[in-house]
Amino acid sequence: MIVIPRYSLIKEKASERLPELLENLNLKKPLVITGKNTKKYSKGFEFIYYDEIDIYNEEGFQKIGKEYDSIIGIGGGKPIDIGKIISNKSKKPFVSVPTTASNDGIASPIVSLTQPSYLAESPIAIVADIDIIRESPKKLLSAGMGDIVSNITAVLDWELGKIEMNEKYSDSSGIFSKTIAIELIDYVLNYDLKEYPKKLVKSLIGSGISIAIAHSSRPASGSEHLFSHALDNLKNKYELNINSLHGEQCGLGTIIISQMYYEEGRIDFKTVEKVKNSLKAVNAPVTGKKLGFDEDLLIEALSSAHKVRKRHTILRNGLSKEKAREILEKSEII
């Protein structure tokens, strides 16, 4: 069964309507999961800080399930991800209240806090207060663009999986996901960015819904995400103090992978340029140096990305370090 949000409030002062929304859903005793910087949006509700929760405490989840009738995640990626985990374990509906828009986790059923990520349930409702989101750090909002443009290469990888591996593919989910990315790219390239936060949130919610339709992360996560996870692995391996965000890394990965698809003749060069220019338009990094990684790390990440998880992509069985360098140079990442 496909579960997608029943309600989406995406407007200025939307958070003020949260009590009304809960009443409409007949939810009387929610538990809020939030952070210390976002607890101010939890007034009137019982709350727990996300970093005080043991996500492996099954007994605790059962207790929450008995005491509360719903879970609300208020904040960025971690409170919302942990809210999904608790919702999934306690069998209670989840309401997503993002305070920024850096990735499509605000609406998707994917829990990415743990690796490998896994499918839980989509939020029953999303309350996105544009006044709050507009005031969030610009770095987070530009990262959101990176997560959206990645739908372009993710869908190409999914189509490749269908062609080369006879993988199950959903036309509706694939088209929906790709269209969301194309529309946001066209917006940031052709209009002023006054409405960018609202457009971005709508796109991220749509991307999350495409995942729910497919019951897979395939429409929004391909080789560009493998590259991002490979960068994360290297940050851990070498204990690097690089403050790069998931969406920023995925945006850079999308530039790289779109170059590879251009060279295979599956997209035109105009698409590659649009991806890069849309990221530039929102001040997202488009080179490894701006992201904080040197050439050797980028080459190691790209040549090892195919090992991150078992998923057929244009990386296939992997790139040599020589080929990785060539692609990085052609895409002007290094």
UniProtKB/Swiss-Prot annotation:
Substrate binds at D104, D147, H229. GO terms for molecular function: glycerol-1-phosphate dehydrogenase (NAD+) activity; glycerol-1-phosphate dehydrogenase (NADP+) activity; metal ion binding. It comes from the Archaea. GO terms for biological process: glycerophospholipid metabolic process; phospholipid biosynthetic process. Its EC number is 1.1.1.261. Keywords: Cytoplasm, Lipid biosynthesis, Lipid metabolism, Metal-binding, NAD, NADP, Oxidoreductase, Phospholipid biosynthesis, Phospholipid metabolism, Zinc. It is an enzyme of class 1 (oxidoreductase). NAD(+) binds at G77, K78, P79, I80, D81, T99, T100, A101, S102, S108. One of its GO terms (cellular component) is cytoplasm. Zn(2+) binds at D147, H225, H246. It catalyses: sn-glycerol 1-phosphate + NAD(+) = dihydroxyacetone phosphate + NADH + H(+); sn-glycerol 1-phosphate + NADP(+) = dihydroxyacetone phosphate + NADPH + H(+). Its cofactor is Zn(2+). Pathway: Membrane lipid metabolism; glycerophospholipid metabolism. It is found in: Cytoplasm. Its main location: cytoplasm. Binds 1 zinc ion per subunit. Catalyzes the NAD(P)H-dependent reduction of dihydroxyacetonephosphate (DHAP or glycerone phosphate) to glycerol 1-phosphate (G1P). The G1P thus generated is used as the glycerophosphate backbone of phospholipids in the cellular membranes of Archaea. Belongs to the glycerol-1-phosphate dehydrogenase family. This is Glycerol-1-phosphate dehydrogenase [NAD(P)+]. It comes from Methanococcus vannielii (strain ATCC 35089 / DSM 1224 / JCM 13029 / OCM 148 / SB). The gene is egsA.
